[in-house]
């Protein structure tokens, strides 16, 4: 299993223009309040989105939520389904906002 990623590492990847699949598993109201331009797939809808994600099965997928708990669950789900490079953002959106603001 691939290591999780810190907010600082995520910001470096974004700033460098690196390619990865970026998913936000929070709820729509949380996404509207603040987001990092990730694709919104609320955790409860993740099972129905699996087919859309299958083409990215062997690509780096970075998942975040508010604090890291829901994205941790999403990482486990995708890893169990054979996705090979799934990373959870440690601290999530709260840590991003603490370090970098909105």
What do these predicted ranges mean?
Residues 1-21, 25-60, 66-102:
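Rhodanese-like catalytic fold shared by cysteine-dependent sulfurtransferases
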């Amino acid at each position: 299993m691939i290591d999780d990623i810190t907010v600082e590492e995520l910001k470096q990847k974004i700033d460098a223009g690196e390619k990865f699949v970026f998913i936000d598993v929070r709820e729509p109201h949380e996404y509207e309040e603040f987001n990092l331009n990730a694709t919104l797939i609320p955790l409860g809808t993740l099972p129905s989105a699996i087919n859309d994600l299958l083409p990215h099965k062997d690509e780096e997928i970075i998942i975040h939520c508010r604090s890291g708990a829901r994205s941790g669950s999403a990482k486990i789900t995708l890893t169990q389904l054979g996705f090979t490079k799934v990373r959870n953002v440690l601290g999530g959106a709260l840590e991003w906002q603490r370090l970098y603001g909105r």
